[in-house]
Amino acid sequence: STGSTGKQIRALGFKCIDISKITKTKEMFSGRVKTLNHHLYSSLLYKRDNKEHKKQFLKLNIPDIDIVVVNLYPFEEYYNNNTNKNLLEMIDIGGPSLIRAASKNYKYITAIVKIEDYKKLIQNLEKNNGKTDIMFRKKMAYKVYNHTSKYDKIISKWLNEK
């Protein structure tokens, strides 16, 4: 995890891995580059039932990622409040990329983008012995693409206003 997301996950009593342990790098450019890394995306995008993918993945010596939880930068909130904050810095790049990659691979990975789904995630994990079921993962993938679509639409609207 990065930043506040990890704190929220730990507050719920769950463990999470600091993103730098997977990326094997530190944040760069004042936090603009945190998660854009081939190690991380390898864990998110490889097909776990594909022997060649698995072989390539094992050579990377990084953990499987089963759950991705991302809270996107609050661009809409700052936009709606006419804040003086530089809105360009509130455009999340890594977050949408992470959840979209995880959702593309929903057969194996759960992506969570809404805080109100944290409890649903916990319930699904408890119901399925520490795993999530395919229907839950697919529903969460739908939410990801719906959420990122709205997020991009607001950014596009703002850019068109200038």
Q: What are the residue ranges of the model-derived segments?
A:
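Internal alpha/beta core interface subdomains
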Residues: 62-162
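Short hydrophobic alpha-helical runs that function as membrane-insertion/retention elements
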Residues: 1, 17-18, 110-112
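Short, polar loop motifs at secondary-structure junctions
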Residues: 2-5, 96
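Glycine-rich nucleotide/cofactor/substrate-binding loop typically near the N-terminus or early
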Residues: 4-75
